[in-house]
Swiss-Prot record:
<comment type="similarity">
    <text>Belongs to the phosphoglycerate mutase family. BPG-dependent PGAM subfamily.</text>
</comment>
<feature type="active site" description="Proton donor/acceptor">
    <location>
        <position position="88"/>
    </location>
</feature>
<dbReference type="GO" id="GO:0004619">
    <property type="term" value="F:phosphoglycerate mutase activity"/>
</dbReference>
<keyword id="KW-0312">Gluconeogenesis</keyword>
<comment type="pathway">
    <text>Carbohydrate degradation; glycolysis; pyruvate from D-glyceraldehyde 3-phosphate: step 3/5.</text>
</comment>
<keyword id="KW-0324">Glycolysis</keyword>
<dbReference type="GO" id="GO:0006094">
    <property type="term" value="P:gluconeogenesis"/>
</dbReference>
<dbReference type="InterPro" id="IPR029033">
    <property type="entry name" value="His_PPase_superfam"/>
</dbReference>
<feature type="binding site">
    <location>
        <position position="61"/>
    </location>
    <ligand>
        <name>substrate</name>
    </ligand>
</feature>
<dbReference type="InterPro" id="IPR013078">
    <property type="entry name" value="His_Pase_superF_clade-1"/>
</dbReference>
<feature type="binding site">
    <location>
        <begin position="184"/>
        <end position="185"/>
    </location>
    <ligand>
        <name>substrate</name>
    </ligand>
</feature>
<feature type="active site" description="Tele-phosphohistidine intermediate">
    <location>
        <position position="10"/>
    </location>
</feature>
<dbReference type="Pfam" id="PF00300">
    <property type="entry name" value="His_Phos_1"/>
</dbReference>
<dbReference type="GO" id="GO:0006096">
    <property type="term" value="P:glycolytic process"/>
</dbReference>
<feature type="binding site">
    <location>
        <position position="99"/>
    </location>
    <ligand>
        <name>substrate</name>
    </ligand>
</feature>
<feature type="binding site">
    <location>
        <begin position="22"/>
        <end position="23"/>
    </location>
    <ligand>
        <name>substrate</name>
    </ligand>
</feature>
<feature type="binding site">
    <location>
        <begin position="88"/>
        <end position="91"/>
    </location>
    <ligand>
        <name>substrate</name>
    </ligand>
</feature>
Amino acid sequence: MTRKLVLLRHGQSQWNLDNRFTGWVDVELTDQGRQEAVAAGKLMKDEGLQFDVAHTSVLKRAIHTLQGALKELDQDWLPVSKSWRLNERHYGGLQGLDKAETAAKHGEEQVKIWRRSYDIPPPAMDVNDPGHPCHDRRYATLDRNALPGTESLATTLVRVLPYWHDAIAPQLKAGQTVLVTAHGNSLRALYKYLNDVSNEQILELNIPTGIPLLFELDDNLQVRSFRYLGDPEAAKRAAEAVANQGKAK
């Protein structure tokens, strides 16, 4: 039996548009981002996908993308689970900074390492910074020590995997079709795990906003195939645009 899993990065956010490091900052979708959510729903509808359950983060850009896609799918009623474990990677002291200006200051190669390397985190955010997640009530029930002040992709994967094993994988093994709407780096972490991508290869992976990535898995949740829905060239161009965000102007 083939299991189906769709990974969907949220639509364009205001800070995507502004080319700023976002991380755990809870920013809104742009008008384009809302349109991308609807377009993603249409692509999934055209594919004939009927989901049994959906998962998202606790950040509104992912939540609103999921809502827009489900409305287009006419599956608004779908059970939705929200978890902080699906949040974007925490960008530490870089959060809020302009990516191009940061590249001009520190060099494009350093910014690429901070953005795309596997195990090198950006400079940490001080725990006394008002933006640290320990001061946000949506995380009030969590162990303060579990809340990051910065993350690499490696530590993001450590955060995401328990949710995969405890929540998503059992549903797929039960034959359910699952939609996960999250963020560029939490989805890169899942992609790395599912496809057994090397630490070096993951550096070059960029996930575009608002384009559903369909995985077909076997009974043991091994990947049989995966592809972006819609025009492959459009997905390629969108991924290249993501890669260019960390370059100096």
